């Protein structure tokens, strides 16, 4: 006979489900999420205050993350007000199909969109000049973002950094010319496609503060060729198709105007090539949300695959300081290592710590399990068993264990997750299945009361209940 008893702390285990806690004030509830526990159907209520502390869904491929985000987004878009804006970074086009409708704003390179929905014609200059008093700072930030990957992953960062300054010089000179005919993506692309270095030097020489940029392209030498080829290559790569038009749409202005859904459609086929543009678009959404002069309304930012947008310049501020400005981030992540690789271990840890509401689905890598176990902490347990030598009787051993042991995670089925909020005891839940906007979710995923047979050291599995 064996027996385990917690003497310090608590444990999340399959037979001991904990009641889902919920706020009592129904007027403040933004999300009403029915879930299944061993006690039956209960509800997770998320208020606007709790959403302002952000939501993270962590889990492997096919574990149920997107289903959860669908359930959350469906309730958010159903209650959007003229003071709110919802921005969705859509990696597979699924969110646009599920939640898009005529009048929504779509930024992306997709050639085929659902009926009645048109792609916005983005104008990079409009986003730079939206704040007349901060044009210089805005442009510096835009150029830094566009060249970030090249600067970080180049053995000789001089060339991408010089090319960045050159792009800044051309764009700021164009802005100062006040010639509206050249203040668009198409004109910028055409300028660099037919670049004449002598005319470029002449353009930069018109302004004293841009003369330093001329040093990069002095003479006909290897340095000049390297810098010019770097900037031309980037412009040709990122300003293509839908992003190379004579547009007039500013994504920051769309956020500022509110009352809309904005979709940033990621093109998986050329995602790595266009990564600087997608990063720039989402960074400007975050920047606009953090620079709002009014706290009225909410800015919901949904990121289905967090790791596809490494090095977002404003994500840490958005997570840690956006709460008072109505910023509410819902992010999906496949594993923790992706965040460590994208942002570095310490920066990633700081960003992840800003998410107060967490849904941990089944993960398949040790790094993610370790992160979850260390986040939830340890407990002390007494393990009692009958000695094989009868004269010794019962033997008790005290050991330290994790709140969530590996065997618990091994048995999580698709659609089940560990729900955790700071300051509250975590609970294992089964989520319903999203069936479409306006439809009641199906209680497809449910959890039967499950026990661990300590005598045989085996675990009985979950039962799927419809």
Where are these regions (language model features)?
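N-terminal accessory nucleic-acid engagement/regulatory domains that precede
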Residues: 1-16
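Conserved ATP-driven motor cores of ASCE-family P-loop NTPases powering translocation/secretion/packaging/pilus
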Residues: 319-321, 325-421
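P-loop NTPase motor domains
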Residues: 2-6, 21, 27, 34-42, ...
């Amino acid at each position: 006979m064996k027996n385990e008893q917690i003497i310090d702390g608590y444990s999340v285990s399959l037979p001991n489900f904990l009641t889902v806690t919920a706020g009592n004030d129904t007027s403040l509830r933004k999300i009403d999420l029915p879930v299944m526990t061993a006690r039956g159907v209960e509800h997770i209520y998320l208020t606007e205050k709790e959403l302002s502390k952000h939501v993270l869904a962590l889990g492997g491929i096919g574990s149920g993350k997107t289903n959860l985000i669908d359930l959350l987004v469906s309730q958010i878009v159903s209650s959007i007000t003229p003071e709110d804006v919802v921005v969705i970074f859509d990696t597979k086009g699924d969110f646009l199909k599920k939640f898009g409708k005529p009048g929504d704003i779509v930024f992306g390179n997709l050639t085929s969109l659902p009926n009645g929905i048109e792609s916005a014609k983005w104008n990079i200059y409009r986003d730079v000049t939206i704040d007349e008093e901060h044009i210089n700072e805005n442009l510096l930030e835009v150029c830094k973002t566009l060249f970030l990957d090249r600067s970080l992953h180049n053995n000789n960062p001089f060339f991408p950094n010089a090319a960045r300054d050159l792009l800044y010089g051309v764009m700021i000179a164009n802005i100062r010319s006040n010639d509206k005919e050249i203040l668009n993506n198409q004109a910028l692309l055409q300028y660099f496609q037919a670049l004449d270095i002598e005319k470029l030097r002449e353009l930069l020489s018109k302004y004293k503060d841009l003369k330093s940029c001329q040093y990069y392209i002095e003479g006909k030498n290897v340095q000049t060729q390297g810098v010019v080829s770097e900037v031309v290559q980037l412009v040709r790569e990122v300003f293509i198709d839908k992003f190379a038009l004579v547009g007039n749409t500013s994504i920051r202005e769309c956020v500022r105007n509110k009352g809309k859904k904005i979709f940033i459609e990621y093109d998986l086929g050329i995602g790595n090539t266009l990564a600087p543009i997608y990063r720039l678009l989402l960074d400007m959404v975050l920047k606009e949300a953090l620079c709002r002069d009014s706290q009225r309304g909410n800015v919901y930012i949904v990121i289905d695959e967090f790791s596809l947008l490494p090095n977002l310049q404003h994500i840490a501020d958005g997570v840690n300081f956006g709460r008072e400005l109505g910023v509410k981030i819902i992010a999906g992540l496949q594993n923790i290592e992706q965040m460590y690789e994208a942002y570095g271990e310490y920066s990633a840890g700081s960003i992840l710590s800003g998410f107060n509401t967490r849904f941990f689905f089944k993960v398949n890598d040790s790094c993610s399990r370790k992160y979850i176990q260390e986040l939830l902490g340890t407990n002390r347990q007494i393990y009692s068993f009958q000695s094989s030598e009868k004269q010794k009787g019962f033997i008790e051993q005290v050991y330290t264990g994790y709140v969530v042991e590996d065997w618990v995670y091994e048995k999580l089925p698709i659609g089940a997750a560990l729900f955790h909020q700071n300051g509250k005891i975590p609970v294992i839940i089964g989520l319903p299945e999203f069936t479409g906007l306006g439809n009641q979710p199906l209680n497809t995923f449910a959890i039967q009361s499950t026990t661990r047979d300590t005598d045989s050291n085996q675990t009985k599995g979950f039962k799927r209940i419809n």
